[in-house]
């Protein structure tokens, strides 16, 4: 009887002084474990008579319950203390200035490409893609380039060591190659644009060895220059968001179109005319090369440089700046990730 009281006081003294849950668990094992103090007292029941065993067993069970309650109460206190400590350690000091969030931005070429694509999508144009590495047929022959055309020369075109049909492969010099592939693999009518990288051996303030083009093709029955002029005029005014912009279609020559024209624009009457794109009716020889009957279908094509349009719209003077990676320049000419272009809300930020 006296031993039970001593055990209870010992348990109370030890448990009340515990500072963490790990130590509390150790005391739980010490008193209530398989080889614990209370368990040791229970083993004494075998040496008692029936009446003594009944009385002593009742007292031991009460002792066990009291110690369990003491441990439970202490555990709740320690858990609350640990939670409060963790919350205090994780507390945010609202008086500390926030760190500047380093957010990326959209490159002007990407933004301009998206704006151009968005405008053409209003006309119902879809997007076609093709490989950057091309063969001679798709890049030149199918587009009605003569064998001695200057564009085929080494100083204008990047040729590769790999060959196809005894002719070297090359980096495409325009995305007109996509038009050839699409016409070969499909059937008219067509209405699509082909955005992508193109490559030419040239480098100065207005030329880089790699640049971005968007070329377009419309083909159906009874297509004429009037349709071409309407699409180009509406596109230019929409992209530059200027209904008063002036355009002129100047006669020109391209192997793959006949008649051909270059389009010049000026924002105001006192400005100089600026060349922005080339266009024309698809040459009958091109249609023949892709298996389309030119007596039944006609079409027009156009091509523009994305960098050229970006320079005009964003007032960028040197084409090479697009690719130099100057962080100061990129921070100045940048667009937010959510500046999604649309005609209804205005195309630019």
Curated annotation (Swiss-Prot):
PROSITE patterns documented for this protein: AA_TRNA_LIGASE_II
Cross-referenced InterPro entries: aa-tRNA-synth_II, aa-tRNA-synth_II/BPL/LPL, Phe-tRNA-synth_IIc_asu, Phe-tRNA_ligase_II_N, Phe_tRNA_ligase_alpha1_bac, Phenylalanyl-tRNA_Synthase, tRNA-bd_arm
GO cellular component, one term: cytoplasm
Gene3D superfamilies, per database record: Bira Bifunctional Protein, Domain 2
Gene Ontology MF term list: ATP binding; magnesium ion binding; phenylalanine-tRNA ligase activity; tRNA binding
Cell compartment(s), UniProt: Cytoplasm
EC number, as in UniProt: 6.1.1.20
Note describing how the cofactor binds: Binds 2 magnesium ions per tetramer.
Keywords: Aminoacyl-tRNA synthetase, ATP-binding, Cytoplasm, Ligase, Magnesium, Metal-binding, Nucleotide-binding, Protein biosynthesis
Binding positions for Mg(2+) per the UniProt entry: 258
Cofactor: Mg(2+)
Highest taxon in the source lineage: Bacteria
Reaction equation(s) it catalyzes: tRNA(Phe) + L-phenylalanine + ATP = L-phenylalanyl-tRNA(Phe) + AMP + diphosphate + H(+)
UniProt key word NADP: no
GO biological process assignments: phenylalanyl-tRNA aminoacylation
Recorded family membership: Belongs to the class-II aminoacyl-tRNA synthetase family. Phe-tRNA synthetase alpha subunit type 1 subfamily.
HAMAP family: Phe_tRNA_synth_alpha1
Record text on subunit structure and interactions: Tetramer of two alpha and two beta subunits.
Protein's name according to its UniProt entry: Phenylalanine--tRNA ligase alpha subunit
Organism of this sequence: Rickettsia rickettsii (strain Sheila Smith)
